[in-house]
């Protein structure tokens, strides 16, 4: 478990936390996209948990152009304010390109010779964008904030996408949720689950809206999904 540096290909390099499975042999690569709090302990623990299941987990720092090395929590209003400022100040297209190098080259960054690569997004829109725009083998989206602005790309999703949506998400109005579900309905590559009665970040261990039963169900589905599509 370590931090590495990855060339961005445009204007520098960024760090990423890497958790490798035991044994050191080939393993499917999993790019874990951070929440708005940076590559903090929650994200590192999540990567470690995936590595324990046999995945090569990489969590890139998406805030590196603004403020490298952000690690904050969701425990105070000041931290929330800082997190939202970072998120709102980010160039979404560059955020997308930052997530591509780890996905394209888990072998190239000399961690391990990855066989297949997937993405897990804890937060907003990136997994949906990657499913529509990239060559990653499988993508998982938690919570789905802002997806209603991407429904025009739903028909472009040709790789497996699993979506976990909170019914009572304070950041996703019911109208927006239904718009997204209608857009992906009928696409055989998309599986969407709505979790009744839970709020945003219901799967964030230790978070204010953590719901153990819903989290266990969602995380179990995620593990099975990646096992099916990444091997």
Curated annotation (Swiss-Prot):
Iron-sulfur among keywords: no
Entries under Gene3D superfamilies matching the protein: alpha/beta hydrolase
GO MF annotations, alphabetized: carboxymethylenebutenolidase activity
Catalysed conversion reaction: 2-(5-oxo-2,5-dihydrofuran-2-ylidene)acetate + H2O = 4-oxohex-2-enedioate + H(+)
Record keywords, A-Z: Hydrolase
Active site: 169, 200
Signal peptide: none
EC number(s) recorded for this UniProt protein: 3.1.1.45
Family: Belongs to the dienelactone hydrolase family.
Name under which the protein is recorded: Putative carboxymethylenebutenolidase
Species this chain originates from: Azospirillum brasilense
Lineage: Bacteria, Pseudomonadati, Pseudomonadota, Alphaproteobacteria, Rhodospirillales
């Amino acid at each position: 478990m370590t931090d590495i540096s990855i060339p961005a290909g445009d204007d520098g390099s960024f760090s990423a936390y890497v958790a490798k499975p035991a044994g050191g042999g080939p393993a499917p690569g999993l790019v874990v996209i951070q929440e708005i709090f940076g590559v903090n302990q929650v994200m590192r623990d999540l990567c470690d948990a995936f590595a324990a299941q046999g995945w090569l987990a990489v969590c890139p720092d998406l805030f590196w152009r603004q403020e490298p090395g952000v690690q904050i929590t969701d425990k105070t209003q000041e931290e929330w304010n800082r997190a939202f400022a970072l998120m709102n100040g980010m160039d979404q297209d560059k955020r997308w390109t930052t997530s591509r190098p780890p996905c394209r080259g888990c072998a190239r960054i000399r961690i391990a010779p990855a066989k297949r690569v997937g993405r897990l997004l804890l937060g907003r829109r990136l997994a949906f964008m990657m499913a529509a725009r990239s060559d990653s083998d499988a993508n998982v989206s938690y919570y789905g904030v802002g997806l209603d602005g991407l429904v025009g790309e739903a028909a472009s999703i040709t790789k497996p996408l699993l979506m976990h949506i909170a019914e009572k998400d304070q950041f996703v109005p019911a109208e927006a949720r239904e718009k997204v579900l209608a857009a992906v309905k009928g696409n055989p590559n998309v599986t969407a689950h709505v979790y009744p009665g839970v709020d945003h970040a219901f799967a964030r261990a230790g978070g204010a809206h953590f719901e153990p039963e819903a989290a266990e169900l969602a995380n179990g589905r995620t593990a099975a999904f990646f096992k099916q599509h990444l091997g």
